[in-house]
């Protein structure tokens, strides 16, 4: 990824955006190595959560995104608690994500399973919001599927911040 960023810098870009959640595990390391501003999907999502006054949010995404803690560690530093599904649920979410959503397959049975996981996070963990920490997750549900929590689509949040930066 560093080589690609170097190519972008040589081409004259003024900012770099990594428009995917999972690679953000390397974001801070990359940012420290380059002399160009990088806009983080994680930071922008946490900024949005903070602006909404939410303190406890669930996180769905690839198993890597859910388990590596880069949302949780940055969230803790801003007073936002990030709750991830248990390991069995993470395996199911990852399977649906990699075997269906990345291929644009919208399976209603899978949607029901995901909603059951989210419902558990609402009831047992008290989440106030849900981070769609995988850019394909918005293919299967959005805010209209939930009335008690705020859905935070990281892709939309990141694009909004990119537009704000460039306008």
Question: Residues of each region from the PLM?
Answer:
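Non-catalytic structural scaffold of enzyme domains
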Residues: 1-167
């Amino acid at each position: 990824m560093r080589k690609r960023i170097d190519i972008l810098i040589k081409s004259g870009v003024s900012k770099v955006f990594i428009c995917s959640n999972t690679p953000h595990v390397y974001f801070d390391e990359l940012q420290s190595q380059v002399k160009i501003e990088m806009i983080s999907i994680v930071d922008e999502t946490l900024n949005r959560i903070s602006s909404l006054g939410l303190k406890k949010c669930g996180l769905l995404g690839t198993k890597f995104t859910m388990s590596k803690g880069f949302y949780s560690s940055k969230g803790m530093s801003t007073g936002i608690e990030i709750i991830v599904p248990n390991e069995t649920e993470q395996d199911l979410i990852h399977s649906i994500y990699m075997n269906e959503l990345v291929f644009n397959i919208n399976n209603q049975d899978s949607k029901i399973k995901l909603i059951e996981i989210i419902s558990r996070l609402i009831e047992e963990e008290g989440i106030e919001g849900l981070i769609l920490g995988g850019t394909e997750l918005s293919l299967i549900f959005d805010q209209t599927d939930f009335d008690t929590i705020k859905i935070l689509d990281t892709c939309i949040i990141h694009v909004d911040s990119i537009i704000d930066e460039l306008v």
